[in-house]
Amino acid sequence: MNDSVLPLGHLMVFDALYRHGSAGKAAHALSMPQPTLSRWLAQLRTHFDDPLFVRTRSGMEPTPLAARAAPHIAEMIAIYRQHVRSELRFDPGTSNRNFRIAASDFGQALMLPRLYATLEETAPQVRVTGVNLRHGPLVEELESGSIDIAFGGFPTLSAGIKTQTLFREEYVCVMRQSHPALTHGLDLEAFRQCRHIIVTAHEFNHVHEQVEARLLELLPPESIRFTTENFLVSAVIAEETDVILTIPSRLARWFANRGGLTIFPVPIELPSIEVKQYWHERYDKDPGNIWLRRVIAKIGFQNPPAE
């Protein structure tokens, strides 16, 4: 007998022949061409140095060695089906998996409310943890699986990271409804003279870093009243003070719909953001990761989430 390890498919051929007693029926049960089954049976015979199944008037009868091996082979296949193959499937209706999504505070505010309806309807036990987006360890976290999906606007990430573009985002200005600039208009000179709050690009190499650099280049230093690392905090400050905030348009609409901020076009040209979801190639075929990516891709990002 050969000591080499048999592929699982060969063991399944053995099991099907034992159960059905017919090469034709076994091939049909396995959805494989009969010539392939015959070839694998020949390899099994060579491996065991035994005919294994002998053609008789009543069908393919097992040899004594095959009869002794059959229960053990059936047990191995059952273990595979029960434990291994079940891990290769993902059933959102019964899964209690906790997915970790890395995004900025704005990204989490944009995505998580939209995920809620899908989770309630199709994945009642699935949980989602939103974590802060940090470029430094992001690739390592995606590779290790500690982060399932990242959501944001990175121009480039290292090899091994797969992406899907979700939407393109433009920048606008927001200010509170009693802001003096609303009376006089917001041309470039007025924009430079107003007080500003700037969100810093704490996510290194994020597209927002280019926007921050452009604003710092254009605005007099004394006009920058606040800097923060948080979009939502900055928007709250803009609601309460006479500062102008330059932010992505979807976040601006989110606050404007609540009545606290007024939207104005930016009087300078700024780069837009191509917002994508990111995952590591190690998990490209992971059923749970595939399900989450499909759910995210179907989310309607064009409008604010329902109140």
UniProtKB/Swiss-Prot annotation:
CDD domains referenced in this protein's UniProt entry, alphabetically: PBP2_DntR_NahR_LinR_like (cd08459)
Entry-linked PROSITE patterns: HTH_LYSR
Gene3D superfamilies membership: Periplasmic binding protein-like II (3.40.190.10), Winged helix-like DNA-binding domain superfamily/Winged helix DNA-binding domain (1.10.10.10)
InterPro entries reported in the protein's UniProt record: LysR-type_TF (IPR050389), LysR_subst-bd (IPR005119), Tscrpt_reg_HTH_LysR (IPR000847), WH-like_DNA-bd_sf (IPR036388), WH_DNA-bd_sf (IPR036390)
Pfam families: HTH_1 (PF00126), LysR_substrate (PF03466)
PANTHER family cross-referenced by the UniProt entry: HTH-TYPE TRANSCRIPTIONAL REGULATOR LEUO-RELATED (PTHR30118), TRANSCRIPTIONAL REGULATORY PROTEIN (PTHR30118:SF15)
Identification of the protein by name: PCP degradation transcriptional activation protein
Organism of provenance: Sphingobium chlorophenolicum
Gene: pcpR
